[in-house]
Amino acid sequence: MTTENAAIPTKKKKSFWKKMKPLFGLTVLIPTAFSAVYFGLFASDIYVSESSFVVRSPRSQSSLSGVGALLQSTGFSRSQDDTYSVQEYMRSRTALSALEQGLPLRTFYSEKGDLLSRFNGFGLNDTQEAFYRYFKERLSVDVDSISGIATLRVHAFDAEEGYQINERLLKEGESLINRLNERARKDTIEFAEQAVKDAEKNVNETAQALSQYRIKNKIFDLPAQSGVQLSLISSLKSELIRVETQLAQLVSITPDNPQVPALQMRQKSLKKEIDEQTRQLSGNGNSAATQTADYQRLMLANELAQQQLAAAMTSLQNTRGEADRQQLYLEVISQPSKPDWALEPSRIYNIIATFIIGLMLYGVLNLLIASIREHKN
């Protein structure tokens, strides 16, 4: 009786182990065997070409440390925002199109490598979008947030091809920086040039208004002309005083002197002329005083326009110099490498990782099955 009771758990244990064997083989043995065969025999070598660069700008007043201080000691500081711009550009479709114009990228990635690693190994999707997604996975651009240094890594099936892609990407990044420089310089200088054009237009308009006013009012030198008119009035008044004095003497001595009527006519004529000259000088809307105010207003407007033009031209010269000084530069710190050893795939690591993941999956499924059976019982 005791022997029979002891045999029952043994049979149950064997039955349980038999049921678990297919699950263990499915989750652990088969994936591990496939991983060992693939990574041990078929997986193609992948070479990683690496380079590093930094985008720098003329030195600012900010204080930096490390590599930033090193760049400042040479007169430049890092420009991290623009480094991120280069990073995004290198991983963009635009950069891929530029690369394909000079390198046979599809040939690099579709005619070499094993079926699982190469592009479109099973001939299912040969579109440009599929190739872009594939190439994006073979490219990495990491930026150090502290130093601002970017590291570019290109994964390829051939060391020389990876080197060529890396080198070409650096040139494309430099071209991007040059385009950004040119665009910023063009926009800045165009704004300053437009200010000069506006100032020149204002000078021409005020000068034309002043010229038309001079022609209309027959003014060539208003201060000199006003001075002549004042001198004329002064002379007329002196002449009037002389005539009045002479007339008074004649009237007191010989009232019937025939010169008296002539002097009286002369006196009347001088007074009329003095009144007319005085009226022209300051008596009506077209007087010299009014003309002087209008003339001075036009002269002031013209002088201000000339000053604005001079300031705009000075600003344009300064802007050109500043635009030249604010150029960005892509400085290559380490040139693209041409590796002689395939860093990928990590064959042993991948096999062990497959085994461990299979064990974890097996354990989870085992617990799940046991829980379901216990629930049914």
Curated annotation (Swiss-Prot):
Family listed: Belongs to the BexC/CtrB/KpsE family.
Subcellular locations according to the entry: Cell inner membrane
Organism phylogeny: Bacteria, Pseudomonadati, Pseudomonadota, Gammaproteobacteria, Pasteurellales
Gene giving rise to this polypeptide: bexC
Membrane-topology annotation of the record: Multi-pass membrane protein
NCBIfam families: BexC_CtrB_KpsE (TIGR01010)
Transmembrane intervals: 23-43, 351-371
Molecular function, one GO term: carbohydrate:proton symporter activity
GO cellular component: Gram-negative-bacterium-type cell wall; plasma membrane
Keyword tags: Capsule biogenesis/degradation, Cell inner membrane, Cell membrane, Membrane, Polysaccharide transport, Sugar transport, Transmembrane, Transmembrane helix, Transport
Main location: membrane
Natural source organism: Haemophilus influenzae
Protein's name according to its UniProt entry: Capsule polysaccharide export inner-membrane protein BexC
Task of the protein: May form an ATP-driven capsule polysaccharide export apparatus, in association with the BexA, BexB and BexD proteins.
InterPro entries listed in its UniProt record: Bact_polysacc_biosynth/exp, BexC_CtrB_KpsE_VexD
Entry's Gene Ontology BP terms: polysaccharide transport
